[in-house]
């Protein structure tokens, strides 16, 4: 049986080998790190009173770290107790030690906050590569968090950028954010209210003459009124019957009503604010290219350009109506212009996404959908297969019924979609026994298909939600860096006096101390007990 070697300890800073000979710190480091027999020796690591025991060869897997390099960890060696002492977070060291045992797997314990565990990674010097991989696994922001966000170099531009881009930066920035949210809400309310029949009739200036149907002052046809559901979709349009006396006399009235309409005036004020906000943010942004790559800025552009297109089209239309007499070709061109304009102005509804700039919940939802694109793609693919399968099955099951509501397989696509999604619209339904069996299987398959990827999406949402919560807490509290011996040292139980113990402690004082965060002075401090 191999005799177990041991280390005989002498005075502080002095180590004796297996035969009792005296060794200095350098010889002890070489004996500890090199050689096949010594690499299997075990050592004790004391983390704030909790003792861990491991082998030297386990720590030597990562020689560039604090524990893997004998020259670095010897500064924490306590010759009085024959152990390495670290006044650090105890739950975190389980994961740190597992990093060595597993060959590079770094997993944060669930009961350790993110910022505290990252401090432990830096203290034990696991390296920037391990820290970057850990941050990527945790889905963290780039190193430095809020301090690393690009800011303009000019002081005035920086202040303007913070005012309009970061509502949490100051009180005036929060005030601007509140104004922006109110303007967005007013714009959305106006977009909805202007489609009400009573407002459209009042805005047009009256009703029809003798038929009981609301028409514009120019006596437009009922078909044109249906097409013009917007408040300012060509209020000066020429009626289908040509430009008569009544139409000519009311042309100027129509043009005036467009620009004096209350909905148009409120919409104009909202657009003025949106345009001002966009131009100010663009002029103060640190990178013009990155500005247009931001999806929120693209939404801002999409939210305002329909107004200018509508306004320009209205001015051109008024000019053409005043210079060209009516006709069928002119009316057809107007009808096409109306259809195009309605599609363009429908984009105004995307203005509601501007709220996501000021809503953490919408941002979390967007990140969840972005992270769940693979699962959503699988869901759509499964639904596509089910729609093809069950629409074909119900068509052939109902083919012998003369009253069948499924004239073809493509017509049955709609039924398959609403059945698999458990909506059950009711406009199409099977009437034969075989068709009802197919419908039952379709509903069951739809429930299973939709239920499979939902837990993954919910898990992604919980992940982003808890990450956002931790980042908010990190902005309020910061863990106090510990590990340095206190200057007020007291006498110990082994008989050493206060001066002797202080001298021995200075010899073991670590040269590596974590650099305090730049923003620590500006935050409330939370000391770990």
Curated annotation (Swiss-Prot):
Region feature S4-S5 linker, mapped onto this chain: 360-373
GO molecular function terms attached to this record: delayed rectifier potassium channel activity
Residue ranges of the region described as Disordered: 1-35, 203-238, 488-513
Known catalytic reactions: K(+)(in) = K(+)(out)
Residues carrying lipid (S-palmitoyl cysteine): 285
Motif extent (Selectivity filter): 422-427
Similarity remark: Belongs to the potassium channel family. A (Shaker) (TC 1.A.1.2) subfamily. Kv1.6/KCNA6 sub-subfamily.
Record's subunit section: Homotetramer and heterotetramer of potassium channel proteins. Interacts with KCNAB1 and KCNAB2.
Name of the protein this chain belongs to: Potassium voltage-gated channel subfamily A member 6
Organism: Mus musculus (Mouse)
């Amino acid at each position: 049986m191999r005799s177990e070697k041991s280390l005989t300890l002498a005075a502080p800073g002095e180590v004796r080998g297996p035969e009792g000979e005296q060794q200095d710190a350098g010889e002890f480091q070489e004996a500890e790190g090199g050689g096949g027999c010594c690499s299997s020796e075990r050592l004790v690591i004391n983390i704030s009173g909790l003792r861990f025991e491991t082998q030297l060869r386990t720590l030597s897997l990562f020689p560039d770290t604090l524990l893997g390099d004998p020259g670095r960890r010897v500064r924490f060696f306590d010759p009085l107790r024959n152990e390495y002492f670290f006044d650090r977070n105890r739950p975190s060291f389980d994961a740190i030690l597992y990093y060595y045992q597993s060959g590079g797997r770094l997993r944060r314990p669930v009961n350790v906050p993110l910022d505290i565990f990252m401090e432990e990674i830096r203290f034990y010097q696991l390296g920037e590569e391990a820290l970057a991989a850990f941050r990527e696994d945790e889905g963290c922001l780039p190193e430095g968090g809020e301090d690393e966000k690009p800011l303009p170099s000019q002081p005035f531009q920086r202040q303007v950028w913070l005012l309009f881009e970061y509502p949490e930066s100051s009180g005036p920035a929060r005030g601007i954010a509140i104004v922006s949210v109110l303007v967005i809400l007013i714009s959305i309310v106006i977009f909805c209210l202007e489609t009400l029949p009573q407002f459209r009739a009042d805005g047009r200036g009256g009703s029809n003459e003798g038929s009981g149907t609301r028409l514009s002052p120019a006596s437009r046809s009922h078909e044109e009124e249906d097409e013009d559901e917007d408040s300012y979709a060509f209020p000066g349009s020429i009626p289908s019957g040509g430009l008569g006396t009544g139409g000519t006399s009311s042309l100027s009235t129509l043009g005036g009503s467009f620009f004096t309409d209350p909905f148009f005036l409120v919409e104009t004020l909202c657009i003025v604010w949106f345009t001002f906000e966009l131009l100010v943010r663009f002029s103060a942004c640190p990178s013009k290219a990155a500005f247009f790559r931001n999806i929120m800025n693209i939404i801002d552009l999409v939210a305002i350009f329909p107004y200018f297109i509508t306004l320009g089209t209205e001015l051109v239309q008024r000019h053409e109506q005043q210079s060209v007499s009516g006709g069928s070709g002119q009316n057809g061109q107007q009808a096409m212009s109306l259809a195009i304009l309605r599609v363009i102005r429908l984009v105004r509804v995307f203005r509601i996404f501007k709220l996501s700039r000021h809503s953490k919940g919408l941002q979390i939802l967007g990140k969840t959908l972005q992270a769940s694109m693979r699962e959503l793609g699988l869901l759509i693919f499964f639904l596509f297969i089910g729609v093809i399968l069950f629409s074909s099955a119900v068509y052939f099951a109902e083919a012998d019924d003369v009253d069948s509501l499924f004239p073809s397989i493509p017509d049955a696509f709609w039924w398959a979609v609403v059945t698999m999604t458990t909506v059950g619209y009711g406009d199409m339904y099977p009437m034969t026994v075989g068709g009802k069996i197919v419908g039952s299987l379709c509903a069951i398959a739809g429930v299973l298909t939709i239920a499979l990827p939902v837990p993954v999406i919910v898990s992604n949402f919980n992940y982003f939600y808890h990450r956002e919560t931790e980042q908010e807490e990190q902005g309020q509290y910061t863990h106090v860096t510990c590990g340095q011996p206190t200057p007020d040292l007291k006498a110990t139980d082994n008989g050493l006096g206060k001066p002797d113990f202080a001298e021995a402690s200075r010899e073991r004082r670590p040269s590596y101390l974590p650099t305090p965060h730049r923003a620590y002075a500006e935050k409330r401090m939370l000391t770990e007990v």
